[in-house]
């Protein structure tokens, strides 16, 4: 298996998982304000 392919897949997975988390954090920050 290519290491570059694994890195790309892991980065995409992290982005897809971190996306909603970042949105939730921004939502909470706006709610606190």
Curated annotation (Swiss-Prot):
The cellular component terms of Gene Ontology attached to this UniProt record, alphabetical and capped at eight, are:
chloroplast thylakoid membrane; photosystem II
Range of residues in the leader sequence? none
Is Ribosomal protein a UniProt keyword of this protein? no
Keyword Transferase attached: no
What is one process in the GO biological process aspect for this record?
A: photosynthesis
Q: How does it sit in the membrane?
A: Single-pass membrane protein
User: Entry's InterPro entries?
Assistant: PSII_Ycf12_core-subunit (IPR010284)
Question: Transmembrane region positions?
Answer: 5-25
The role this protein plays is:
A core subunit of photosystem II (PSII), probably helps stabilize the reaction center.
* HAMAP family noted in UniProt: PSII_Psb30_Ycf12 (MF_01329)
Q: How does it assemble?
A: PSII is composed of 1 copy each of membrane proteins PsbA, PsbB, PsbC, PsbD, PsbE, PsbF, PsbH, PsbI, PsbJ, PsbK, PsbL, PsbM, PsbT, PsbY, PsbZ, Psb30/Ycf12, peripheral proteins of the oxygen-evolving complex and a large number of cofactors. It forms dimeric complexes.
Q: Which family does it belong to?
A: Belongs to the Psb30/Ycf12 family.
Question: What NCBIfam families does the database record attribute to this sequence?
Answer: PRK13686.1
Q: What is this protein called?
A: Photosystem II reaction center protein Psb30
**Species annotation:** Euglena sanguinea
């Amino acid at each position: 298996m290519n290491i570059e392919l694994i890195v790309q897949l892991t980065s995409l997975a992290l982005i897809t998982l971190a996306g909603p988390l970042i949105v939730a954090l921004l939502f909470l920050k706006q709610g606190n304000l």
